[in-house]
Design a protein with these regions (language model features):
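Active-site neighborhood of phospho(di)ester-bond hydrolases with catalytic His/Asp-centered motifs
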Residues: 6-8, 49-55, 79-85, 122, ...
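Active-site environment of divalent metal-dependent phosphoester hydrolases
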Residues: 13-16, 58-63, 85-93, 126-129, ...
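Binuclear metal-dependent phosphoesterase catalytic core
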Residues: 22, 182, 202-266
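Extended active-site neighborhood of metal-dependent phosphoesterases/phosphodiesterases
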Residues: 61-142, 146, 178-189, 207, ...
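Short glycine-enriched, charge-decorated loop/helix-capping segments at active-site entrances
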Residues: 17-23, 97, 127, 165-172, ...
């Protein structure tokens, strides 16, 4: 059984700054503290790594990326970083040169685990809020898929499907059809798809492939099926996902690590 974590939509600003009334860096510190305590090597649920599925910063500021790097160094396990629409590839690479990129400079990479192949994709379109995969990125994905014949776990920032929230659905991956054409021959190997961007806990299936997203680390998107001309923000609790992937199951837990609700023995 492989245990790993997902964190998303940090929206860090320069240290000392606030965003929509919140301090994103302080929330990251609390998340790192909680992940290290609950999922460190001596815990009951040690994690192999955390995948951070994009929007690492809000404005792509160098100081924000440097603050991110400093906090992630406190984790007792590796962090795999991805970019979202609020990010800057150049800014991220300048602050954290070790971030893997492909031969064309896209922030995406693949690695193998006991549970299968993990493929982390770059759906960023500079200056635009929606996601997309150009022909170069789709070709890269196709190559990564044929390198292995085992289970595959996919990670991207933008969802490739509509989820019924008008404010979010217009910002999905524009090339979803072409994306699926690359994935379709490998349908039986696709165990799960993880993404961020929505700032909401959503799960379901797309072309039969299970997917899930979680709330962001910073602000959230309120559940409003009628919001068509604005983004209904909220201060709902931040969360991260705890994923347990085995040979015959994938279980995704959402942990509201900032929820002050009292806990007790039943």
């Amino acid at each position: 059984m492989l245990t790993f974590l997902q964190l998303t939509d940090l929206h860090l600003v320069a240290p000392g700054g606030r965003l929509y009334g919140l301090d994103p860096l302080e929330r990251l510190r609390l998340a790192v503290d909680d992940m290290a305590r609950r999922h460190g090597p001596d815990s009951a649920s040690p994690a192999a790594f955390v995948v951070v599925t994009g929007d690492l910063t809000h404005n792509g500021e160098p100081d924000a990326y440097r603050a991110l790097a400093a906090e992630l160094r406190r984790l007792p396990f590796p962090a795999h970083l991805m970019v979202g629409n609020h990010d800057s590839r150049a800014g991220l690479r300048a602050a954290i040169p070790s971030v893997p990129v492909d031969a064309r400079g896209f922030v995406q990479h693949a690695f193998d685990t006991p549970a299968g192949r993990f493929i982390l994709l770059d759906s960023l379109v500079p200056g635009a809020p929606h996601g997309d995969f150009c022909a170069t990125r789709l070709e890269w994905l196709a190559d990564r898929l044929v390198e292995s014949d085992g289970p595959v776990f996919l990670f991207l920032h933008h969802p490739p499907m509509e989820v019924g929230l008008p404010s979010s659905d217009r910002l999905m991956v524009r090339s979803a059809g072409e994306f699926w054409e690359v994935l379709a021959p490998h349908r039986e190997r696709l165990r799960h798809m993880f993404f961020g961007h929505l700032h909401r806990p959503v799960c379901g299936s797309w072309h039969g492939v299970p997917f899930s997203s979680i709330r962001g680390l910073a602000h959230q998107l309120w559940l409003d099926f009628g919001a068509t001309d604005h983004y209904p923000g909220s201060h709902e609790p931040a969360a991260y996902a705890v994923v347990r992937a085995g040979l015959d199951s994938v279980v995704v837990h959402t942990h509201d690590f900032m929820d002050p609700t009292a806990t007790f023995n039943l």
